[in-house]
Every structure is written in structure tokens, then in C-alpha cells.
Amino acid sequence: MVSKTIRHFTIWQPAPVRSWGAWALVLLALVLPACRKKGPAGSEPARGQTTFTSPEDAGKALVDAAKNGNQQQLLAMFGPDSQGVILTGNAAQDKASLAQFAEAFGRMNRWRQLEHGSQVLLVGVSNTAFPIPLKKDSSGEWFFDTKAGKNELTNREIGRNELANLDVCGMLRIAELEYFEQSHDGEKQYATKFISDPGKQNGLYWPEEPGKPKSPIGPQIAYATTEGARRQASLHKPFYGYYYGILTIQGYYASGGLRDYTRNGVMNRGFGFVAYPAKYGITGVMTFIINQDGIVFQKDMGATTTEEAPFMRQFNPDGSWLEVKE
């Protein structure tokens, strides 16, 4: 059964590396270069925002506030518009995250200068980059550039969502194979929908009942679909920033050529899935497709992603799609 818990993104912890090897490392390695290329986001601190005489002073103030859980001090350091950036609103999680950051800072910390003169704080033995850089204002004082930090957080969240959805694509494939091993309506077949009809097991998800097999996927993924929006709008939410669809045909560029996965009203000749960002450029950039062969392809479909991807029905990785290497 495929299901995960969605965790609020926090600036105090590094994004988790998932099981896609070098691809994960490449994405994480892009974090600092992204900062360097974009350059400074603003030139002056917000009114009332704390400034510092040196990066070292800023680092000391930051870790002291983290150790003490001093939210007011943190808000003063990052500016009046930083509430939703530095804190999640979950008191227990914020406390744990701050403590984890303080521990990492205590193990190792140093500042790295970026090309445009800003400084980024690296903490812990893995040199995790704190997402909000330090910048000099016109008077020579240092301040945390929260605007640039927001951009960096968006980039990191996109990277984490994309890594997570590479995993989801693989797990959806496994879910269909698992579904196929069970008899449905007297024959083996792949599911053509995510959510089963009431009292049936004709989709990849059905409510759990004592003494009956569990569905191959959980409700979070099942309702992160256009089908889920129709069934129960209150449960329709993106999973790790993405929505999903089932592909019922493969095109000329797929292995084996053009083929309808359905024969005589039953889908037993293959299957495919598409995973696309709920908000292009905010929750994700790449759209992913996979079929029964287990190879994931990706494509940047641009600003029209959310208009086109929900209507995709064909697995057809032509030259505009790139194979994702593990």
C-alpha cells in the first residue's frame, strides 16, 4: 500500500534524500549554484529588522535564538514578513527543528561568500546551507535577506517534491502490478481508475475493511487526482505538490510502438501514469510519466502544464521527454 505523511516544509532542516541515487545528489548540489546565479534580491533590510556588524555576530545571534526558542528574536532578525518562512505554526515541530539546527550549528559552522558578496551559513558535518543568505546594506551592516531566502525555499521545495514524485511514480507502477495479481470481475486486469466504486475493488484505492485485502494505494494519492476532485472535493489535495493521472494508450515513441492498453473493455495490455505539479514553478517544474516497463521520463511542459497534463491519456516519450537515470 502506497501512502506517505506530508510534512510542512521548514527552513531549519535539510530536505531528505530519497532512493534515487545520483539524481538526488544532483538536485541537492544545485542549491548553492542557484543562489549564486540569481544575485541579490534586495538591498536594504526591512524597517525594524535586526542588523549585524559581521557574519559571525549574525551566526551567534541566530543559534542563540534557536537554542532558546526565542520566536520574537527570530522575527526581528528575519523581518516582519518572515512569520510563515521561519515558523510552521506547529509548536512541537518548530521546537524540534530549532533544536536540530542548533545541534548542527554546534557540530560545525562556517560562512561561505557568494559571487555577489552575500554570505551563506553552512552548518553540520554535511555543510547544509541555511536558505536565507546574509547581505550587506548601504551602511555596511549585515542583514538576513529573507526575500532571497523565500526564493531559495521555493527552489528547495520544488526539488524535494520532484524527488518524492519520482518515488511515487515507481510505487504507482508497483501498485498496478499488485492490482493485476488479484482477480477483478473474474479476470486479471489493470485498474483504469484510482478510486473504487462503493463496495467494490475496481480502482487502486478502496476503504480498508477487516478481513479484506488492503488497496494498493492510500487515500492521499487516490484523491490527488481529477477523479478525486469529482468524488470528494474536501479530500482533493496535491501529494507532495503533485497530481496524478492514468494513461491508457502508448504512442509510437514508446517501447513496442502504438498500442491501446485496453482490449474488449479491459485494460490488460499495459498501463501508464502521469505526475504533474499542482502549481507550475511553485510546487514543481517537471512532469513525469511511467508505464509498465518502469522507466520514468520527465519534461518541463511550461506554464501550460496545469492546463494540458490533466488531459493526458497517452504514454509517448518522444524526443522532448528525457529519461530519468537512477
Predicted regions span which residues?
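N-terminal secretory signal peptides that target proteins for export/translocation
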Residues: 1-17
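C-terminal motif of bacterial Sec signal peptides marking the signal peptidase cleavage site
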Residues: 31-34
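Bacterial signal peptide processing site
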Residues: 36-38
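Conserved hydrophobic/amphipathic alpha-helical signal-anchor segments
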Residues: 50-75, 150-199
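Surface-exposed, charged secondary-structure patches
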Residues: 82-130, 233-240, 245-252, 258-267
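Extracellular/periplasmic head regions of type IV pilus-like filament subunits
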Residues: 115, 184-279, 283-286, 290, ...
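Short beta-strand edge/turn micro-motifs at domain boundaries
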Residues: 119-163, 167-170, 295-299
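C-terminal soluble interaction/assembly domains
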Residues: 271-319, 323-326
